[in-house]
Amino acid sequence: MTILRKTHPLMKIVNHAFIDLPAPSNISGWWNFGSLLGLCLIIQIVSGLFLAMHYTPDTLTAFSSVTHICRDVNYGWLIRNMHANGASLFFICLYLHIGRGIYYGSYTYMETWNIGIILLFLVMATAFMGYVLPWGQMSFWGATVITNLLSAIPYIGTDLVEWIWGGFSVDKATLNRFFAFHFILPFIIAAMAMVHLLFLHETGSNNPLGIPSDSDKIPFHPYYTSKDLLGVIIILVLFXSLVLFSPDLLGDPDNYSPANPLNTPPHIKPEWYFLFAYAILRSIPNKLGGVVALVLSILILALFPHIQTANQRSLMFRPISQFLFWLLVSDVLILTWIGGQPVEPPFIIIGQIASILYFLIILALMPIAGLIENKLLKW
């Protein structure tokens, strides 16, 4: 008798994806983040579903409904804190996952990489709309400022912004539609993640050496299921510690004040995971230029497969490119710090230098380093 998991139409799909999948024998802990992102998505969908049962998307009651969840609903404070900090965990795993992809040259799997970029945009859109829902000060002003950026689009900008708002300012219609989109997008993300996996399993996983591993494969289960489980346990311990001990560590105190259109907060800034892009936006004194740079700061990831000049795929044996990679990581951290600072000297010039460096490293220095390393290999 054949094993059921290999013959049953549904179980066969799961089997090929998570059990009998041939995986490279040498992939490291950096390959854990895919499964951890799946875990984050599940945490967010489940906690979000329970929050949606008690939340009201109305400008008059949204803020008090969140307060009601925290005070009156059984374990509501826990669900809310899990959902708010789950977004931070999601982005930590996401950025580490992308960093891994850049370091080990995983971007050469074009379809997987491009679906990943679409996923990044979807997650960012979902997180932004979710931040608006509690209807605190930073929710309202963040929504106003970020949606207003679309008015920089020539000719159709103003109409587009008013169409998104559903009126002439961020109001009840905006909150309502943001709630609707925030609810549906995670399911679209889950579907896209399936496509992401589908394309990945067409080619098989990359590995730290960046060389074909067809001659040395091991089954995914039990080797990588146990390895992923270890990652899950570590992440859940860290996550639970953050949620239970310092749930407001990554949030903005301004969001504990109800939204007031007549009172602008001293520093309008998004959540920490958008600060690097926000810093790039602010470092250009032209509105349209800033918006273009903001979009390009993420879209530039799509160029990686096209600007690789090195003969070796991974950065494991490429010291010059390694240096530039870690310089890029440091640069993104500096941009994140600058994004949270007020617009005044010396932060303005630091942000501008860091923004130029961000694009320079990716578009010029890394391809040049690849060519130099090719020459060094021939010596």
UniProtKB/Swiss-Prot annotation:
Residues given in the record as heme b b562 binding sites: H83, H182
Sites where the protein binds heme b b566: H97, H196
UniProt subcellular location: Mitochondrion inner membrane
Keyword S-adenosyl-L-methionine: no
SUPFAM superfamilies in alphabetical order: a domain/subunit of cytochrome bc1 complex (Ubiquinol-cytochrome c reductase), Transmembrane di-heme cytochromes
Cofactor: heme b
A GO biological process held by the record: mitochondrial electron transport, ubiquinol to cytochrome c
GO molecular function: metal ion binding; ubiquinol-cytochrome-c reductase activity
Purpose: Component of the ubiquinol-cytochrome c reductase complex (complex III or cytochrome b-c1 complex) that is part of the mitochondrial respiratory chain. The b-c1 complex mediates electron transfer from ubiquinol to cytochrome c. Contributes to the generation of a proton gradient across the mitochondrial membrane that is then used for ATP synthesis.
Protein name in the entry: Cytochrome b
Organism in which the protein naturally occurs: Microdipodops pallidus (Pale kangaroo mouse)
